[in-house]
Amino acid sequence: MVPRSRCPHCGHQITALENVPVLSWLCLRGKCRQCRTPIPVRYPAVELLTGVLAAASVWHLGFGITGIAAALFCCVLVALTFIDFDTQLLPDSLTLPLLWGGLLLNLTSGAMAPLSDAVIGAMAGYLSLWSVYWLFKLLTGREGMGYGDFKLLAALGAWFGWQALPAIILMSSVIGAVVGVSLIVFRNHGRQQPIPFGPYLAGAGLAMLFFGGQVMALMGMGAPVSVMATGG
């Protein structure tokens, strides 16, 4: 990737051999090769999580276009999750390719949803959160979420079709509410302090990828595509 990774403490440029996921951290014993500053365990943990999800998606959907696309889908969602936790932002450089990737996959194979459902899902995903955003702003004068959340839900709609949106919104909202209340009660998180919504949308997207059939059945909805029916 450009620019090359550097140690935030001493500025040492990370070489290719020092940047092998998980293995490099183990070989370096969790420290920068130059200044010996400890490297947070979060880095290899995120790398391991990404690898496990990517491998699971290929195992789940097979080693083909759909499985590889799903692996990339998982990688982008993990990246968006931790970027949003750190910065309260969901960059267009990730959300927009995710959206177009879902449309392209369904255009070429219809593996996740028919193209018409994917296009409607992208539009409905964006407009649903956009509407909530402006309604909340009109009522309170504050911004309840960011535009990146709209684009992420649009991307999930492009992947799974409009039928999956109610389940995705419900799952992410419930999990987000539980986490938010827990932070306020147990960790003295300020009521006016923002809580990122992107990670919970991403989690709901992963749930739809692996367990879409069960989720839709549990909510009394028909699974729109054969891929969802194979979930789990």
Task: Go through the PLM ranges and name each one.
Residues 67-175, 217-232:
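Functional transmembrane core segments of multi-pass inner-membrane proteins
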Residues 45-83:
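Zinc-dependent deaminase
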Residues 186-194, 214-223:
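Extracellular/periplasmic helix-loop-helix junctions in multi-pass membrane proteins
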Residues 53, 57, 61, 104-105, ...:
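Alpha-helical membrane-inserting segments
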Residues 19-27, 166, 170-179:
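Hydrophobic, aromatic-rich membrane-embedded alpha-helical segments
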Residues 1-42, 197:
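Membrane-proximal soluble regions of multi-pass membrane proteins
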Residues 40-47, 92-94:
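Select subsegments of transmembrane alpha-helices in polytopic membrane proteins
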Residues 147-148, 181-207:
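Interfacial loop-to-transmembrane junctions
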